[in-house]
Amino acid sequence: MDVVARLASQRAVVIFSKSTCCMSHAIKRLFYEQGVSPAIVEIDQDMYGKDIEWALARLGCSPTVPAVFVGGKFVGTANTVMTLHLNGSLKILLKEAGALWL
């Protein structure tokens, strides 16, 4: 989990993704459309991808991708992120983390 914590704390928003996952694509698109430039970790293309996926599963990510971290803290997977977006909470989290300037 150390590698996940280290990567998650490097930017205001970090998305652990798989390049072939449609939900990962949708979540990345959501953040781009909000004006956020997240760090993207494509675990299927990372040499430590299996270790990262295992660590995400231990955090409770099911499915393991997309896993979204804001301000170094695990926010959730696609369902949670979409819920936060729809109820307006996601923008608040992004502002607090310094990822969004509006």
Curated annotation (Swiss-Prot):
- Tell me where in or outside the cell this protein is found: Cytoplasm; Nucleus
The UniProt annotation puts motif Responsive for interaction with TGA factors at 99-102
Q: Where does [2Fe-2S] cluster bind?
A: 21
Identify the Gene3D superfamilies for this entry.
Answer: Glutaredoxin
Which molecular-function annotation in GO is an example for this chain? metal ion binding
What does this protein's UniProt record list under function? Answer: May only reduce GSH-thiol disulfides, but not protein disulfides.
Q: What is this protein called?
A: Monothiol glutaredoxin-S10
User: Top-down, what is the taxonomic lineage of the species of origin?
Assistant: Eukaryota, Viridiplantae, Streptophyta, Embryophyta, Tracheophyta
